[in-house]
């Protein structure tokens, strides 16, 4: 079963939340951000090239134009490959663990897997960001030395920055699966 909702991020931008329900013990959430627009790419490219052309007319050095083209292309490729994330996915399987995947605009994917035995809880935390209080979903990892301690806090959906209503929906589903996993591990 799959459903999709249109939501917004903390700045008012559009987000799409795709929820795929595979079984009571397996659930996937995918937050999709809008793709980069051709208009913004064109505006940045034209601005850099016009500035370079202005410098070229003053200095009459053709290396300025070549450098502007080269820097623009490298900057665009770097932005698409390392910065612009198209969608983030959270896959929860109660017997295995939690997998987080970030898919960049260039097609590159970054995946992190956390074993369920290391997961203490999934919570909604708050932070101050740019003079605002924002909420984010994070995974608390168990401390191997101290049984009731927390060794690490792993944030989820860092790039999309969804609003609280989206986080609550994902949080409740995560808690259902964690409760299902705890019930399965304690039963004989």
UniProtKB/Swiss-Prot annotation:
GO terms for cellular component: glycosylphosphatidylinositol-N-acetylglucosaminyltransferase (GPI-GnT) complex. Pfam families: PIG-H. Keywords: Cytoplasm. Pathway: Glycolipid biosynthesis; glycosylphosphatidylinositol-anchor biosynthesis. InterPro entries: GPI-GlcNAc_Trfase_PIG-H_dom, PIG-H. It is found in: Cytoplasm. GO terms for biological process: GPI anchor biosynthetic process. Its main location: cytoplasm. Coiled coil: none annotated. Component of the glycosylphosphatidylinositol-N-acetylglucosaminyltransferase (GPI-GnT) complex composed at least by PIGA, PIGC, PIGH, PIGP, PIGQ, PIGY and DPM2. Interacts with PIGQ. Part of the glycosylphosphatidylinositol-N-acetylglucosaminyltransferase (GPI-GnT) complex that catalyzes the transfer of N-acetylglucosamine from UDP-N-acetylglucosamine to phosphatidylinositol and participates in the first step of GPI biosynthesis. Belongs to the PIGH family. This is Phosphatidylinositol N-acetylglucosaminyltransferase subunit H. It comes from Bos taurus (Bovine). The gene is PIGH.
């Amino acid at each position: 079963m799959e459903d999709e909702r249109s939501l917004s991020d903390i700045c008012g931008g559009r987000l799409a939340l795709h929820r795929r329900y595979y079984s009571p013990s397996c659930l996937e959430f995918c937050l999709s951000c809008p793709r980069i627009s051709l208009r913004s790419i064109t505006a940045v490219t034209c601005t850099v090239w016009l500035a370079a052309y202005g410098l070229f007319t003053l200095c009459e050095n053709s290396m300025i134009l070549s450098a502007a083209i080269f820097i623009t292309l490298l900057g665009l490729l770097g932005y698409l490959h390392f910065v612009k994330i198209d969608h983030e996915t959270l896959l929860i399987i109660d017997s295995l663990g939690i997998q987080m995947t970030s898919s960049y605009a260039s097609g590159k994917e970054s995946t992190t897997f956390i074993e369920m035995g290391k997961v203490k809880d999934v919570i909604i935390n708050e932070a101050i960001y740019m003079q605002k209080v924002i909420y984010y979903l994070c995974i608390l990892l168990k401390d191997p030395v101290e049984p009731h301690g927390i060794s690490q806090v792993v944030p989820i959906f860092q790039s999309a920055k969804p609003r609280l209503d989206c986080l609550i929906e994902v949080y409740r589903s995560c808690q259902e699966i964690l409760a299902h996993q705890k019930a399965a591990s304690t039963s004989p």
